[in-house]
Design a protein with these regions (language model features):
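A structured phosphate/pyrophosphate-recognition subdomain
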Residues: 2-21, 36-42, 111-181
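Anionic-ligand anchoring segments at beta-strand to alpha-helix junctions in alpha/beta enzyme folds, i.e.
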Residues: 19-72
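Short, glycine/acidic-enriched loop or turn micro-motifs at the edges of active sites
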Residues: 26, 84-86, 108, 161, ...
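Short beta-strand segments
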Residues: 54, 80-83, 154
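Active-site cofactor/cluster-binding pocket
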Residues: 62-116
């Protein structure tokens, strides 16, 4: 995990533009991981352009808003796809028009579509992975309410409010860390 998280952050460092995708027919984890990563990167790198794209799902509109991105923005962008096991399920097929592609997921690896693929099937959700990614870089202090809220919604969604068998002690301990700043 340490090595791959460092590789992912090294790639993010190289790009001025990052576009984050997720799967079609999104659930709370798709939205939560996508928007959680977006909000975190915006706080960590305020000079970068960070976008979250895909078809909006009206029942999940309360989680957050998605961005409209022109085709030409993809030219020199890093694309990160969250919570999507295989390429045909990626919402917005422009994902392959970026300069580089990273996959971050918790579903069993059925399609290694990214140049960098991080899949942790032991994680309850991709939102949990994004939380671990943030804490790996000791960035807990830049997690604000917007980041914490969407990641929490993603974790709650994929664990069935912590009732499903994918809920681990690690999952339960995530929110016992120091409180996010307001």
């Amino acid at each position: 995990m340490v090595e791959i998280f460092n590789k992912i952050m090294n790639e993010i460092d190289k790009y001025e533009t990052v576009i984050i995708h997720r799967h079609v027919r999104p659930d709370p984890d798709a939205y939560g991981s996508q928007l959680g990563l977006k909000y975190y990167l915006q706080r960590k790198f305020p000079e970068k352009s960070i976008y979250a794209v895909g078809q909006p799902e009206s029942s999940l509109a309360f989680i957050g808003d998605l961005d409209r991105v022109r085709d030409d923005i993809y030219q020199n962008a890093l694309v990160i796809v969250c919570d999507t096991a295989n390429a045909p399920r990626i919402d917005d097929q422009r994902f392959n028009q970026g300069k580089d592609l990273i996959k971050i997921d918790h579903h069993p690896a059925t399609d290694q579509y990214g140049r960098i693929n991080y899949v942790d099937t032991n994680a309850s959700s991709t939102s949990e992975i994004i939380f671990d990614f943030i804490t790996h870089f000791n960035d807990i202090n830049i997690i604000d309410e917007s980041v914490a809220r969407v990641l929490y919604l993603g974790i709650v969604g994929d664990t069935g409010r912590f009732l499903f068998s994918n809920t681990t002690p690690h999952t339960c301990l995530l929110y016992t860390s120091p409180s996010p700043r307001d």
